[in-house]
Amino acid sequence: QLFYDGHQQLAVQLSNLVKAHPACPPSDRLFKVVKFGLESEEELSGSKKIEQNIAPGSGIDLEYETDVQSISPEGALYETCYVTAHKGPCRAGAFHSSGKLIATGSEDASIKILDVDRMLAKSATPAEIIAMETPQQAMENHPVIRTLYDHIDEVTCLDFHPTHSILASGSTDYSIRFFEYSKPSVKKAYKSIQEAAPVRCLSFHPSGDFLLVGADHPTVRLYDVNTFQCFVGRNPSTHHTLPVTTVKWSPNANLYATGSLDGDIKVWDGVSNLVISTFKKAHDGEEVCSVTFSRNSKYVLSCGKDSLVKLWELSTNRCLIVYTGAGMTGKMQHGAQAVFNHTEDYIFFPDENTTSLCCWDSRNAERQRLLALGHNGAVRYIGHSPTGPAFITCSEDFRARFWYRKADTD
């Protein structure tokens, strides 16, 4: 309760004093117990209310959780299964909602789509067997299933349509392009939207009918994917004051979140397009690099160029947990992302200076072991599979690495 109420130092001291194991996450359970106790003194129906409030959802939910055992692997247990190379720095990536496909984008203006099952099969096949493959077999088994060329400048962001075989891409060439990747022969986009500024970020609505776009401009765009009509919020005074750097829909589609160079995080109503809350100077005024929602849409996870990762509770509009220990040598030069793993037990964040993966227990901010990411340059993108223990890292060293936690064989 102390942790939840913002008394982080007191909570840690008390936790150390009573030797709490595992460490206690922030929770308002004590407040709720007292509240229900007072209610039950007045009416006997209080116990029914408690029962109705105990059903836990999947993923992180600090409102109901007490002692949750992590069943998924920490970051240090993953290993590289496949590496693909571009001809320039690789700074964009995306995971399909099925967890079966990955896309990577580069400064060389190309996009690759990779098959996860093929990458896993390739890593499990002995080199001598791969050497014996015919050219036809090699092509059929190759993890890169599509290479798309239609941008004329750096690919900055990617997102898969949730239900159709469509990939959306944004670029510094001022365009958003839509690729139909189910046809092997197609390398060009079937539709292009010309923007007024370089495109920085985009996010598909969970239905796939709308696309959020952030460009080198303070105004967030919302495109109808069927008509390609553009909408913007009708109250400019509440918008960002500097270019938008990150956009993300909530899984329940009721909200979306944005971050900006102005240092603010804004949460918007997904229907009215109006700002409903603003976290001012969310990262001490530094640029906000990423925002993402928890699966139950109750929390926003963010990171900024102050090298801090924060969990925000939307019901109270405040920062609930700060994950510290990354970027010990100072502020970040490049942007990166903080992501949940597939079970939301852990939070992954690439440390720019050490090129290693920082990992925390999402509920109590306990630092886990570091994982060396093996890149020869800063990691510019990290994305975790929504369905299994796998993630992708894209780097300034022109490479994208696919990581997977292999099941124990003993």
Region locations from a protein language model:
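Per-blade loop-tip surfaces of WD-repeat and WD-like beta-propellers in eukaryotic adaptors/scaffolds
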Residues: 69-78, 113-145, 152, 164, ...
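Beta-strand-rich domains and repeat architectures in extracellular enzymes and scaffolds
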Residues: 83-109
